UniProtKB/Swiss-Prot annotation:
Homodimer. One of its GO terms (biological process) is glycolytic process. This is 2,3-bisphosphoglycerate-dependent phosphoglycerate mutase. The active site is at 8 (tele-phosphohistidine intermediate), 86 (proton donor/acceptor). It comes from the Bacteria. Signal peptide: none annotated. InterPro entries: His_Pase_superF_clade-1, His_PPase_superfam, Phosphogly_mut1. It comes from Haemophilus ducreyi (strain 35000HP / ATCC 700724). Its EC number is 5.4.2.11. Pathway: Carbohydrate degradation; glycolysis; pyruvate from D-glyceraldehyde 3-phosphate: step 3/5. NCBIfam families: pgm_1 (TIGR01258), PRK14115.1 (NF010713), PRK14118.1 (NF010716). Catalyzes the interconversion of 2-phosphoglycerate and 3-phosphoglycerate. The lineage of its organism: Bacteria, Pseudomonadati, Pseudomonadota, Gammaproteobacteria, Pasteurellales.
Length: 227
């Protein structure tokens, strides 16, 4: 069986080189075109889906919608869930990556961005931009809404959704599309493929490129490739 991942198209804060995380920003025109191209690639390659999973952030939802529209599958069920959100970058969210590197040093920022288990500076729950003040997450217990995450914590957040929804869908024979974010998809890929803590630092997923994971009937990883 095959599982398709798509990282959302290029966003407004990708263009501005800002840390984004759980902040909700839109796609750029380039991002829209990337999503259209991804949908057209899937259509040309004959990929059909029974269900699509995405996050509750605009850039991923719009990418999912565009991909499905371009591949003539906008009618299939979509599940939007906070567990597929991007990694929460804590106090770094909204900051310029270059300016942050100048302030703290390239090595420290690289560790914050790419280390598997180093947390960024945490955002105060009382901060106006905290997810605690966003009605998208008002139904959640306060203790599960993050104030900052590393990739390890992101995987711990994403894994229950894999086990409860994505894996059962695949095992039931459904063809699955997951349109999410660089780090939530990296976390899932780490689990599925078996990437080591060290190797995951250099594992990247480009925006708007369909990544196909080939799995056996028990969801063991066989191979991966981009369309």
């Amino acid at each position: 069986m095959e599982l398709v991942f798509i990282r959302h198209g290029f966003s407004e804060w990708n263009a501005k080189n800002l840390f984004t995380g759980w902040r909700d920003v839109n796609l750029t025109e380039r991002g829209v075109e990337e999503a259209k191209a991804a949908g057209q690639k899937l259509l040309a390659a004959g990929y059909e889906f029974d269900i699509a999973f995405t996050s509750v952030l605009t850039r991923a939802i719009k990418t999912c919608n565009i991909v499905l529209e371009e591949s003539n599958q906008l009618w299939i069920p979509q599940v939007k869930h906070w567990r597929l959100n991007e990694r929460h970058y804590g106090e770094l969210q909204g900051l310029d990556k270059k300016a942050t590197a100048e302030k703290y040093g390239d090595e420290q920022v690289h560790i914050w961005r790419r280390s598997y288990d180093t947390l960024p500076p945490l955002l105060a729950p009382s901060d106006p931009n905290s997810a605690h003040n966003d009605r998208r997450y008002a139904h959640l217990p306060k203790e599960v809404v993050p104030n900052g995450e590393n990739l390890k914590v992101t995987l711990e957040r994403v894994l229950p959704f894999w086990e409860d929804q994505i894996a059962p869908a695949l095992l039931s024979g459904k063809r699955v599309l997951v349109t999410a974010h660089g780090n939530s998809l990296r976390a899932l890929a780490k689990h599925i493929i078996g990437i080591s803590d060290a190797e995951i630092m250099d594992f990247e997923i480009p925006t708007g490129q369909p990544l196909v994971l080939k799995l056996d009937s028990k969801l063991n990883f066989i191979e991966k490739f981009y369309l």
